[in-house]
Amino acid sequence: MSSRSASRTCLALRHVAFEDLGTLEPLFRDRGFRIGYIRAGAPCPSVREWLEADLCVVLGGPVGVGDTESYPYLKTELDLVRMRLESRQPLLGVCLGAQMMAHALGSRVYPGKAREIGWGTVSLTGD
C-alpha cells in the first residue's frame, strides 16, 4: 500500500520517551498508516480504539512483564494485549511488547542471567 492509499491507524504503546517506532515509523507511514503514540501509565486507549486500530505495536522499556506490582499499569496493558490477540488483529511486540504477547499466550516469561538491551557499538573494518 502506498502513502496515496486510504489512511490506516497504527497505535504504538510507548514505555519511555526515547523508544519509539524508530526505523519502522517511516515504513508504516509510507504504507498509509497514521501513527498515534500512547504513553504507558497515562490513560490507556479505550478498548474500542485499541481493537479498531488497523495495527497496534507494544514497544520496549526498562521493565519486565512480571513487574506488575511495581508498575500496576502493566496489568491494564496485558489486558489490552490479550484482547488484541483474541481479536486476531495485527499486533507487533518489541522487547517488552513481545514479553507481554508471550505471557498473554500462556508462555513462561522470566529474566535472563544478565540484562540486555537491543543496541550495541558497530565498527567498520577493512574487510
Tell me the role of every PLM-derived stretch.
Residues 12, 35-37, 109:
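Conserved beta-strand scaffold positions in the cores of enzyme catalytic domains, especially
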Residues 26-92:
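Flexible gly/pro-rich beta->alpha loop and the following alpha-helix that scaffold active-site loops
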Residues 84-108:
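Catalytic nucleophile loop
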Residues 105-127:
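Pocket-forming structural segment of enzyme catalytic cores
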Residues 13-15, 40, 96:
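Cofactor-binding loop segments of dinucleotide-utilizing enzymes, especially the Rossmann-like FAD-
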Residues 18-23:
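Short N-terminal binding/cap micro-motifs at the start of the first secondary-structure element
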